[in-house]
């Protein structure tokens, strides 16, 4: 046993814990320190104070803790807790919130040491021990500065659309009081761990589980033979095995072979490592060109290595290129990227205690209705026997669209008839969930003597890894966005998604538009250089305008005026930097909101008023930091606040499958668009019913008028109903060769909440700069296994590395959209890499065509 004090109380804990974090969370039930990467100590989420010094508790042994004083956020004084909570709420210093408690602890250590003399740049340096994937750090540093200077601003009131309403549950998130799935405890709860494959392409000959079954604390071990229903799941294609059976073949590094259920997480993980597997190993297919050329099938139970082909043509490209004054050809390469959300995937499943044979699953996924349907499929039961409730997650960015461990956890709970929780380790998370696609894009583009574009031909091949996920849609989106926000009279595009034994390629913020825009912006800058005009000028001359035909043939509506408006908003900053002789680059981008491409998007919401003044708002969208619950609250107040008195403290926002409200994933920057529309309609229903109490007032919003990409029978193919636009200016420091400043003008249609909009954009810029300059998630070409298996190795920018950011909100309303909304979550990193590439070219004269980029001759190259 080990004795020490926690928050002023003497405690004694078991010595068997691998580190202090485990003792705090698993034995003492102190959950403000979060487990984002234990035991590597690279995310900072588990930071606590030991004798007044900030340390990461997942790298602190109990031996080093003995006799010392440990303080967590729970032990802060009420004055300190209120100051930090209010500052982060008022400044918008959090989104998903998972990283914030650890950051607050480190901030306290620095404020205790330096007080009002704490400088922003010093705090940024101390945050080098922490990662935040959501915010871009700017508003975090602002909040800390307010606390340090004893100048905490008042929290804005909760109000309607267009106001700086504080984030829903902001104070609870800042203090670590609003729990995530791993913070949940229920009586009789067991823990599950997974055994993953050791080979990316191998036939399973046998799975020996005896040693695991007899290990301490183990209650059960399950393999594919224990699945009572279907083996395969998937969002679009049912091609992803929940587990690989004996006689089956693995297809990527994240394939699951067995589930171990034990009394503790440590016991489950230790026992899972005891499972022995006999493999017949095959050579992995890890190169897209090999996959296209070979007759061998990379992925088990599929009939070929081409997942999809997306193509369209408009005009005579050959003739237009032949008549062009300038024609440029270039091949661009983008890399695979890991989402690195701070909360690893977690699921809690609880079977019913009566004879009804039901199971309730707590999920952090981006599509709980899809989760429900596939869980029922695996268990071989009706959808009505499964309830999935969303627990607001600690970040996702597309990486939690596919199920990770939801089906495994539900299966274990169902079979053992007890509550089961499964939390992935950071390494398991890296191996299992889908990544951003690496894509090779060959562009050939022409223009006339004035820089007016004439034609574009694109041939793209994307490595979609093993299973379908939404890979075909990512390449479809890349194809649709291939020409960017520009008018190109003739166009010919083909994009192929290829199956390999590499990590699965799926949804990631930008969803194919990032890759396309990196190439398109690079082509524009090369043509501008040929013609002898500026980067701003060539974009201004070619930007899409209302009434023009865009890319796949869609005649653009008034909403596209935002593209030119963003260019106009950035122009003074562009001219000023140019006058100073600073190396700069400009990027312009567009990104759809919604799925489009002929998909019928329908969503519903419920508003329920009670006699005690409480209100329930139920919608179908996953809160993952972007603020959809806040928007739902604002719409409620906007629509009903003048009719009834609404106490925000008595409004509860709920997302679960007890009502049929959802359709698909929270993806494509459509959460605010669709969610606001549905809540607005539900409020209208409540008004029509005389604001009746105790009943569900249901509203529906639908976008069912879009057209499939490449449909030749449609005169005006409306591929997407809504687009967001952004212009970003990247300014370099000539001496250091680093990005000094980013100015971002974003057309958001209507700034539903300016603070949330700014935060989304700042976080996107941070992610976009990493994508452009430092981030990578390569895999070994001989094995298919990823090689960067720690958070630090991913190349994510830390707080001290993030340049100054200035956000300009442009509002050009979108016709037919509620409140004129356009999506903002993804567009923020669509133009970034192209802008950085142009700035680097101005710095050293080298054109870039491969991500991530480095300054020529730098020691980072």
Question: What are the language-model segments listed below?
Answer:
Residues 1, 126-181, 552, 564, ...:
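Intrinsic disorder at enzyme termini
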Residues 148-304, 327, 415:
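Flexible, low-hydrophobicity surface segments
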Residues 293-379, 543-614, 634, 697-718, ...:
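Helix-loop-helix junctions that connect adjacent transmembrane helices in secondary transporters/permeases
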């Amino acid at each position: 046993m080990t004795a020490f004090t926690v928050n002023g109380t003497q405690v004694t804990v078991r010595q068997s814990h691998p580190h202090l974090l485990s003792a705090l969370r698993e034995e003492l039930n102190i959950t403000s320190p979060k487990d984002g990467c234990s035991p590597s100590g690279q995310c900072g989420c588990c930071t606590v104070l030991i004798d007044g010094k900030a340390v990461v508790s997942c790298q602190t042994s109990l031996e080093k803790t003995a006799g010392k004083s440990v303080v967590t956020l729970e032990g802060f004084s009420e004055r300190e807790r209120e100051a930090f909570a209010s500052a982060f709420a008022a400044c918008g210093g959090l989104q998903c919130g998972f990283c914030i408690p650890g950051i607050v602890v480190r901030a306290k250590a620095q404020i205790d040491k330096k007080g009002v003399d704490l400088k922003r740049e010093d705090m940024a340096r101390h945050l080098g021990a922490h990662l935040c994937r959501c915010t871009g750090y700017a508003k975090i540093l602002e909040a800390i500065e307010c606390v340090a200077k004893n100048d905490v601003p008042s929290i804005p009131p909760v109000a309607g659309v267009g106001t700086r309403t504080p984030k829903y549950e902001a104070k609870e998130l800042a203090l670590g009081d609003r729990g995530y799935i791993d913070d949940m405890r229920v009586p009789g709860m067991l823990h599950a761990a997974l055994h993953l494959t050791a080979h990316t392409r191998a036939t399973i000959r046998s799975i020996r589980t005896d040693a695991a079954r007899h290990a301490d604390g183990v209650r059960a071990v399950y393999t594919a033979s224990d699945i009572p229903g279907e083996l395969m799941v998937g969002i679009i294609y049912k091609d992803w095995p929940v587990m690989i059976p004996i006689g089956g073949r693995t297809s990527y590094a994240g394939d699951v072979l067995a589930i171990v259920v034990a009394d503790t997480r440590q016991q489950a993980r230790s026992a899972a490592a005891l499972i022995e597997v006999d493999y017949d190993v095959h050579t992995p297919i890890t190169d897209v060109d090999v996959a296209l050329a070979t007759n061998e099938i990379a992925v088990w139970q599929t009939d070929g290595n081409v997942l999809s082909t997306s193509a369209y043509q408009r005009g005579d490209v050959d003739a237009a290129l032949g008549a062009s004054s300038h024609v440029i050809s270039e091949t661009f390469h983008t890399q695979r990227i890991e989402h690195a959300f701070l909360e690893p995937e977690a699921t809690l499943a609880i079977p019913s205690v009566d004879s009804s044979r039901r199971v309730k699953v707590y999920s952090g996924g981006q599509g709980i209705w899809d989760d429900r349907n596939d869980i029922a499929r695996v268990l071989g039961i009706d959808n009505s026997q499964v309830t999935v409730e969303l627990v607001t997650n600690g970040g996702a960015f597309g990486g939690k669209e596919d199920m990770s461990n939801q089906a495994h956890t539900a299966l274990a709970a169902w079979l053992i008839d007890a509550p089961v929780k499964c939390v992935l380790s950071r390494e398991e998370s890296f191996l299992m969930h889908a990544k951003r696609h690496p894509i090779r894009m060959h562009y050939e583009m022409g223009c006339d003597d004035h820089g007016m574009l004439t034609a574009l031909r694109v041939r793209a091949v994307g490595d979609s890894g093993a299973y379908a996920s939404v890979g075909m849609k990512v390449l479809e989106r890349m194809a649709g966005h291939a020409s960017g926000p520009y008018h190109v009279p003739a166009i010919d595009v083909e994009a192929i998604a290829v199956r390999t034994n590499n990590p699965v390629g799926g949804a990631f913020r930008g969803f194919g538009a990032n890759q396309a825009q990196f190439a398109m912006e690079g082509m524009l800058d090369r043509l501008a250089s040929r013609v002898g005009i500026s980067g701003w000028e060539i974009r201004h001359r070619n930007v899409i305008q209302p009434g023009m035909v865009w890319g796949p043939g869609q005649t653009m509506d008034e909403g596209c005026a935002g593209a030119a408006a963003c260019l106009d908003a950035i122009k003074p900053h562009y001219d000023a930097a140019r006058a100073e002789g600073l190396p700069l680059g400009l990027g312009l981008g567009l990104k759809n909101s919604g799925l489009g491409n002929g998909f019928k998007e329908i969503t519903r919401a419920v508003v329920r008023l009670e006699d005690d003044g409480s209100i329930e708002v139920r919608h179908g969208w996953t809160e993952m930091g972007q603020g959809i619950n806040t928007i739902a609250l604002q719409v409620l107040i906007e629509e009903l606040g003048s009719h009834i008195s609404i106490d925000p403290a008595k409004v509860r926002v709920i997302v679960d499958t007890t009502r049929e409200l959802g359709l698909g994933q929270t993806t494509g920057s459509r959460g605010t668009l669709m969610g606001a529309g549905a809540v607005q309609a539900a409020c209208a229903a409540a008004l029509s019913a005389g604001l009746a109490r105790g009943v569900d007032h249901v509203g529906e919003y639908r976008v069912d008028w879009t057209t499939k990409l490449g449909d030749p029978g449609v005169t005006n193919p409306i591929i997407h109903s809504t687009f967001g636009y952004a212009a970003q200016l990247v300014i370099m420091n000539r001496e250091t060769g680093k990005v000094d400043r980013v100015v971002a003008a974003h057309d958001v249609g209507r700034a539903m909440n300016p603070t949330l909009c700014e935060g989304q954009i700042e976080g996107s810029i941070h992610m976009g700069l990493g994508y452009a300059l430092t981030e990578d998630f390569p895999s070994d070409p001989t094995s298919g296994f990823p090689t960067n298996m720690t958070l630090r190795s991913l190349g994510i920018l830390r707080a001290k590395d993030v340049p100054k950011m200035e956000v300009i909100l442009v509002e050009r309303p979108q016709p037919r959209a509620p409140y004129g909304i356009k999506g903002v979550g993804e567009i923020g990193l669509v133009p970034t890499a192209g802008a950085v590439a142009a700035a680097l070219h101005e710095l050293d004269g080298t054109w870039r065509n491969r991500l991530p980029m480095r300054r020529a001759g730098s020691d980072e190259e």
